[in-house]
Amino acid sequence: MSGGDSPAPRVLLGVSGGIAAYKAAEVVRLLVDRGASVRVLMTPAAQRFITPLTLSVLSKSPVVADLWDPASGAVDHIELARWGEVLAVAPATADVLAKMARGIGDEALSTYALAHRRAIVVAPAMNTWMWAHPATQENVRILRGR
């Protein structure tokens, strides 16, 4: 990822609450191994599948898991928006896709997504019926149009 004297890419990884959340550990490890600086944001549901501690150890940074708990490593979402060069949401549940498409910021990940002004990469992860639902497809169309 980083070559020569160029600074390490700054990646914000948003982890939402589906069974695929456990794969976030491998994503963080791969990014760090390739020279990226990684910060992780988690939804409350994601924390039911993988702990913030796991992702904090792998990313070597505090995980933002709760906007309102200073002990969770929360920082100003505007500060994070300035820091992150790319927001990668993996996995992106139907819930998080809907929040991002409709401008709902009710937890750390969705609030940050509203403040982020750079590249966003989304890796949807849900069952096929949820993916095929017209509401989900409309949310994907909205996000692609931005």
Q: Where in this protein do the model-derived segments appear?
A:
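A cross-family phosphate/adenosyl-ligand binding-site feature
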Residues: M1-R146
